[in-house]
């Protein structure tokens, strides 16, 4: 074996809180307590007021850091009805009850995400 292979073999992955999916943080507001339904509604209203296009993504908690998230349908281009956006979040929850769910506001003027936030974390 080469010296590099010996060093790699000796590296150990020690368990830590980073191995616990419940301890991981994702996107804006992730270090705050879980938002209430009314607080999520206000964030959606903000996204709509900025003219951003909402989109929903979901992913298994254990894959959320190192993998791409799944897009729920297509981004909701031009959608301004907050209740329709909430209904899509709820539909995603029903179809993927064990997944994390993220709401994104795409800013098509700046060609970037205006915001992204976790709106659902499954009970573990």
From Swiss-Prot:
Source domain of life: Bacteria
Further remark: The basic functional RuBisCO is composed of a large chain homodimer in a 'head-to-tail' conformation. In form I RuBisCO this homodimer is arranged in a barrel-like tetramer with the small subunits forming a tetrameric 'cap' on each end of the 'barrel'.
Pfam families: RuBisCO_small
Subunit structure: Heterohexadecamer of 8 large and 8 small subunits.
Family listed: Belongs to the RuBisCO small chain family.
Annotated transmembrane regions: none
Organism of origin: Hydrogenophilus thermoluteolus
Role summary: RuBisCO catalyzes two reactions: the carboxylation of D-ribulose 1,5-bisphosphate, the primary event in carbon dioxide fixation, as well as the oxidative fragmentation of the pentose substrate. Both reactions occur simultaneously and in competition at the same active site. Although the small subunit is not catalytic it is essential for maximal activity.
HAMAP family: RuBisCO_S_bact (MF_00859)
GO biological process: reductive pentose-phosphate cycle
GO MF term list: ribulose-bisphosphate carboxylase activity
InterPro entries on file: RuBisCO_ssu (IPR024681), RuBisCO_ssu_dom (IPR000894), RuBisCO_ssu_sf (IPR036385)
Protein name as it appears in the record: Ribulose bisphosphate carboxylase small subunit
CDD domains per record: RuBisCO_small
UniProtKB keywords: Calvin cycle, Carbon dioxide fixation
Gene3D superfamilies according to UniProt: Ribulose bisphosphate carboxylase, small subunit (3.30.190.10)
Signal peptide: none
């Amino acid at each position: 074996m080469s010296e590099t292979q010996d060093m790699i073999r000796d590296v150990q992955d020690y368990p830590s809180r980073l191995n616990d999916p419940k301890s991981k943080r994702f996107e804006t507001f992730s270090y705050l307590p879980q938002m209430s339904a009314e607080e999520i509604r206000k964030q959606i209203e903000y996204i709509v007021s900025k003219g951003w296009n909402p989109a929903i993504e979901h992913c298994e908690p254990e894959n959320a850091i190192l993998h791409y998230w799944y897009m729920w349908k297509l981004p909701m281009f031009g959608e301004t009805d907050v209740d329709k956006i909430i209904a899509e979040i709820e539909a995603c929850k029903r179809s993927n009850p064990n997944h994390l769910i993220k709401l994104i506001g795409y800013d098509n003027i700046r060609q970037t995400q205006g915001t992204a936030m976790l709106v659902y974390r499954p009970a573990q």
